[in-house]
Amino acid sequence: MDIGTINFNYQSRAVYSAHPQTSRGRLFHEKMNTARTPFQRDRDRIIHSNAFRRLKHKTQVFIADESDHYRTRLTHSIEVSQIARTLARALYLDEDLTEAIALVHDFGHTPFGHAGEEALNEAMMQYGGFDHNAQALRIVTKLEQRYANFDGLNLTWETLEGLVKHNGPLLGPYAKNKEVPSDILQYNAKQDLALDCFAGLEAQCAAIADDIAYNAHDIDDGLRSQFLTLDQFEHVPLTAAILKEITDEHPQLDQARCGYTLVRRQITTMIEDVLKQSHENLARIKPTSINDIYQAKQTIVTFSPSMTVYEKELKNFLFENLYYHEQILSRRNAAKCIVQKLFNCYYENPDTMPESWCQKAVHLKNQELARLIADFLSGMSDHYALREYHRLFDHTNHFV
């Protein structure tokens, strides 16, 4: 079959979207596939990876063994990809690339959510620190070892640059004041990811979809856990307006269904706001190619100014009432202790790691050993980290 006969135009694309036929390719050259575009192959490689499966037992706020219904990194990533594809379709972007970036964006996260990352970053501080985006890049370019001709997944340039820069440029005048992790700089020396430019719109869709999903679904989990009540949301401008609509339409609706309806309508409201604002941004900038997106002096897929305020107020509310809840903080502290003690144990006694990792640790010292341990630790699920802690230290459930 002639590769030229593949229908790469199965969906309408804007002139400023990514296109598989003009992809900048992969670090290691591969023949084109006769059935799938390069971005479809990226998505499929991500889904079939070990790192993707491990997301099933990694959490964000609630620990994985607390309930079967709280969200994990896996369910969150799927929900982000669904929202991101909705945005991409409405903006005439490449949906497969958008989905790939959305599905891979959490690969580098540690067990126990942000508490685990804070603990690992503190343990790694004298060895270069730990950053989940840099770790995700390590995973897809080095640590996943499934192919005969290369380490990593050998993803396209567009997926990698979207992974690394979905929150904005890392270098140059529009970068946030944050040191670029060495792993990103080292890879960038091999394959230039244009770290001083904005990411493509597909990555921007994945980034804002992450925000939309995170806020809405933490409300859902907060209500499910009973750490939050619907009454509290009557004092948050965005949710108060939605709740009023719901109660006006369904005055007898029970609390559970009201909560689910709140979450659904909040997602819809935010998506509609992003699309309206993004269309306005595009109309003003008038990009004629994807390079105009890379060289833009701003993020294009954004909330409106008013929604930005509402979203910040909602985040503040969640921090004060959920993330800083006494029981959540207690579990965060326990999680940090587990990660810190595991790191120290492995660093002082590398032979306590599983055999395959012990072999890698032979002759490694200082920063190289610490980075190996960070690779091992960050790849753990919540369940595996707890098992390791119990094996090495005690049999107490520290989250009871």
UniProtKB/Swiss-Prot annotation:
For this chain's UniProt record, which GO biological process terms are given? dGTP catabolic process
Pfam families, per database record: HD (PF01966), HD_assoc (PF13286)
Superkingdom per UniProt = Bacteria
Could you tell me which PANTHER family the record lists for this protein?
A: DEOXYGUANOSINETRIPHOSPHATE TRIPHOSPHOHYDROLASE-LIKE PROTEIN, DEOXYNUCLEOSIDE TRIPHOSPHATE TRIPHOSPHOHYDROLASE
Q: Which family does it belong to?
A: Belongs to the dGTPase family. Type 2 subfamily.
* Cytoplasm as UniProt keyword: no
**What protein does this entry describe?**
Deoxyguanosinetriphosphate triphosphohydrolase-like protein
The record, for HAMAP family, names: dGTPase_type2 (MF_01212)
Residue span(s) of domain HD = 73-215
Q: Which organism is it from?
A: Bartonella tribocorum (strain CIP 105476 / IBS 506)
Q: What are the protein's GO molecular function terms?
A: dGTPase activity
SUPFAM superfamilies, per this entry?
HD-domain/PDEase-like (SSF109604)
Xref: InterPro entries: dGTPase (IPR006261), dGTPase-like (IPR050135), dNTPase_2 (IPR023023), HD/PDEase_dom (IPR003607), HD_domain (IPR006674), PHydrolase_assoc_dom (IPR026875)
The entry's keywords: Hydrolase
